[in-house]
């Protein structure tokens, strides 16, 4: 999808940023520049943990940093009266999801793609990279690992499906 045309560049950047950080749509819509900090390990994003006063730090990977640089340039070009410290200036939720559906269609994706797909992408990529389920749950702002188990189940089903494909490839 990344290389396909999207009806709005802001939608594309916000969706991809969520793919790289695991933020929910509302969190991306409300994300402010003061939630992004420089730490010893690079840029991090601070986010609340559900049903808690805690805050967790999520590392910002290079592709997400590039999106932030683009957003920062766009922010700097806004007239002073339009600056509200939000990182992304997005359309309504309905329009946002319409853009995502059109974008998926442009990418020849037949599945139901919506903003939540970006969080699923983040979680499955993190687990495939070997990130611990507990760490993933924290990065996603979840206060228990059980809530993140759904992503591990997706990986297990994917593994089973790939195992069958491998078996079929080697059967004579």
Report each predicted region and the residues it spans:
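Short basic/aromatic active-site micro-motif
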Residues: 10-12, 90-94, 110-129
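Short helix-to-turn junction characteristic of helix-turn-helix DNA-binding domains
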Residues: 14, 18, 71, 104, ...
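DNA/chromatin major-groove-contacting recognition/catalytic segments
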Residues: 3, 56-59, 66, 70, ...
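Basic, Lys/Arg- and aromatic-enriched nucleic-acid-binding interface segment
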Residues: 1-25, 29
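Catalytic-site neighborhood detector that most strongly recognizes the C-terminal catalytic loop/helix
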Residues: 49-53, 93, 140-165
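Short, polar N-cap/turn motifs at the start of nucleic acid-interacting alpha helices
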Residues: 35-42, 110-112, 131-151
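Conserved tyrosine-mediated DNA breakage-rejoining catalytic core shared by Y-recombinases
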Residues: 21, 30-70
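C-terminal catalytic core of Y-nucleophile DNA break-rejoin enzymes
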Residues: 50-69, 81-102
């Amino acid at each position: 999808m990344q290389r396909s045309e999207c009806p709005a560049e802001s939608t594309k950047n916000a969706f991809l940023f969520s793919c790289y950080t695991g933020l929910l749509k509302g969190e991306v819509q409300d994300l402010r520049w003061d939630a992004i900090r420089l730490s010893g390990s690079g840029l991090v994003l601070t986010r609340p943990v559900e049903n808690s006063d805690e805050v967790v730090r999520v590392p910002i990977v290079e592709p997400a940093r590039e999106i932030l640089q683009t957003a920062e340039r766009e922010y700097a070009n806004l007239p002073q009266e339009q600056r509200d410290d939000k990182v992304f200036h997005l359309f309504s939720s309905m329009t946002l999801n319409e853009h995502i559906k059109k974008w998926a269609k442009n990418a020849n994706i037949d599945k139901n793609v919506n903003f939540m797909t970006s969080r699923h992408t983040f979680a499955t990529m993190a687990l495939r990279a070997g990130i611990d389920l507990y760490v993933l749950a924290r990065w996603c702002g979840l206060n228990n690992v059980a809530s993140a188990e759904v992503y591990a189940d997706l990986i297990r089903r994917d593994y089973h499906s790939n195992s069958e494909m491998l078996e079929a490839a080697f059967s004579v």
